[in-house]
Amino acid sequence: MGLSRKKIFTWPLLLTGMAVVSTTFSSCSVFNFFSNLPTTTDNNNYGPTVQNLSAFLPTSDYKKIYDLSFSLEFNNSGGYNPSRLMSNNEGVTAENVNRPYRVFGTGWLFDWQAQPVDENDQNAKWTGYFATNLHVAEALLNPLDNKNYRPAWYKNELPLPGVDQTLYFNLGKWDENLAVQNKHNPKSLTYLPLSNLPKTVYTATSFYKESPKWITPIEADNPGIREYIDFAVLSITLDLSWTMRNGEKVHRYNDEYQLYNRWIMPAMNVAKALWDNKGVLNQPATPPNKKEEDDQLTDQLPYHGFFDRSNYTNPNVSLNNFSVYLGGYPYYANWPTTPQYTKFSVPSLSRRQIPITSDSRGSPGWTINALNPTELDGQKIASSTSLSSTGGIRAGIYNADIARNFQLVYRNVKYKQYGYGYIIQNSNLSAGSSGSLALTSNNQALGIYFGTVSVDAKKEATFGLVASLFNPNKIQVNVVTGNNVFETDTIQPYDLIYGNDLMTDDYGSYIRSLQTLNLSSRLLTKIKDNLPKKEGSTNQANQQTNQTNRSTDATKKDSSSDETNKNPLAELLSDIFKNLPNWN
């Protein structure tokens, strides 16, 4: 890495969330975390990978994550792919780059098309938007992907022979009662190659209008490097089309229709409840962020909605009054009780030959961050770790900005991880779990799981790292960058879902990307419905508008600025930031 400064200790960041499998290897990405703060590591937080519960489905908050979460499997051809060779973290060499390989990850549904599925439409389709990690989305090599995210080396929508591409994509889910069955019927559906490849809707890369200012060691090693957060959104489409035969409705892809009813419908129901954040399902067990009796500050309650937008970097906002639930699909090699997923061939109408295969080394298995069936209350934020103390923000929160080698290659461009996240105890879910939803006991998404750290090749941390998707305020902390040398590290406000005025108008956030790609979305529709009404609106409509959530971005510019007035999209989004939707 060309390091020229003294290293006091080294933490390799192990991106355990992604499993890459070929005919010869299975490996995870290893990064280094360097700090010049003289301290020792917390031995209590390191050890063998946590033995979390697998193939276990409790009826608690973990059930909500289960309903929302899916196993993602990308089956790629191998071949020319400069990103893989540039990454140097998958065991890829010039000798094996042409071999077929598979990449596993986890994704969760949080939004979907605006219009409900019309059962009377013979060409019916359903499209959902699934959150996952950027380093998982990197494995999607769809020649028909949205132009902004299609690999540049394709040059057109039909890559030449010898170029790496995704041949087919499997959507999977653990079925507690039917995980090991081989009969081809809807009840045993656990892993299905879909008739359409996913597409990329959003990646958290270069999302600011101006490049962040990095501390000197990082800027010196990587001049001009841009920012990323390990978050992406993929669109997954199910073909629900049908025709009449002998007086009966026959679906073209019956398995996808069954998948929609068996998996997607429950996922949408849970997501709707979390967005509403009301009713018995969504009442926290204890009042969130309860202040001490002698604390004169006002309680800061979470915003209503799917995502937790509380400012947990504020030391006056408690990190102790909620638990964090994680559930994902780690890949297990030689796992003693390996779940062998049933795999079906895509019907012949897809015109792709998809083999029915079984991997003796294992398949992804549903796993949660619970150590035994009697302790299902989630895990707390690990407040006593050197990882958070070196970051300077507060105990329990890591600072990705100063993690010198928290880097990633996406589409042959190297990025540096930005922002901050949470350190969750006993939450190392191992390979394949990248992209898992971190749900709090307040029934909101705290962020997205992407990995853990390791002090050496054999000693991983027991905690997991969850990237924050939201930073409401400018954060400035002093960090040590050399012997008796201090610098100010600044993390600007960001909001990966809604965006803010510091972020680009086209692809800076999920909502802005939807607008740019001209895609429909239930969330986007609700946002528009909650925008202030034009002249002539009734008092009732105005009152309804006044009840919407307000953005907490302190750096927001005046919406009447020249730049905003010249850009219709920016004008619309400027209203969105100030009028976040009320889901009641």
Curated annotation (Swiss-Prot):
Q: Which UniProt keywords apply?
A: Cell membrane, Lipoprotein, Membrane, Palmitate, Signal
Q: Which GO terms describe its cellular component?
A: plasma membrane
Q: Quick one: signal sequence residues?
A: 1-27
Q: How does it sit in the membrane?
A: Lipid-anchor
Composition-biased stretches, type Low complexity, lie in 538-552
> Is the Cell membrane keyword given for this protein?
yes
Lipidated sites in chain (N-palmitoyl cysteine): 28
Q: What InterPro entries does the record point to?
A: Mycoplasma_peptidase_DUF31, Uncharacterised_MG067
What Pfam families does UniProt report for this protein, alphabetically?
A: Mycop_pep_DUF31
Give the residue numbers of the S-diacylglycerol cysteine lipid attachment. Answer: 28
Q: Where is the composition biased (Basic and acidic residues)?
A: 553-565
Question: Which parts of the sequence are annotated with region: Disordered?
Answer: 530-570
| Localization | Cell membrane
- Reading the lineage from the top rank, the first entry is Bacteria
**Sequence similarity:** Belongs to the MG067/MG068/MG395 family.
Task: Give the NCBIfam families listed for this entry.
Answer: Ig_SerProt_MIP (NF045841)
**What name has this protein been given in UniProt?**
Uncharacterized lipoprotein MYCGA2980
The taxonomic lineage of its organism, from the top, reads: Bacteria, Bacillati, Mycoplasmatota, Mycoplasmoidales, Mycoplasmoidaceae
